[in-house]
Amino acid sequence: MSKFEVIGGRRLKGELVPQGAKNEALQVICACLLTREEVVISNIPEILDVIKLIDLLRGMGVKVERLQKGEFSFRANEINFDYLETEDFYSKAASLRGSIMILGPLLAMHGCGLVPKPGGDKIGRRRLDTHFLGFEKLGATFE
């Protein structure tokens, strides 16, 4: 069995600023859809998948403002549900596996949602059917 052995004798002290992580950032950003109030999120890694999700939310009608590096303001008070049926939405959402994370907040706030079968990064076992099964157990139906 592998282990880390820490040999010290000195008290640890200091400050550590954690680096933003993509998968957590995608989930936290999607949570802005759970309120119509302004949400400010900091420590967001400005990497391709995160920027794609922010662009997708903008298309949905979420007002997004970059306040400074790694800090954004979101306001989801007017969701454009017509956009969810456009080719632009379909292609953007399908190219981002994390787009599945918009579905829960849309169902919770509006009682409906739409996402194409996501593509994107497929490293490891990350099944999407667990999301759908959970939604069905909460009363959602899928077409």
Residue ranges and their predicted role:
Residues 1-143:
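Structural preference for solvent-exposed beta-strand-turn elements
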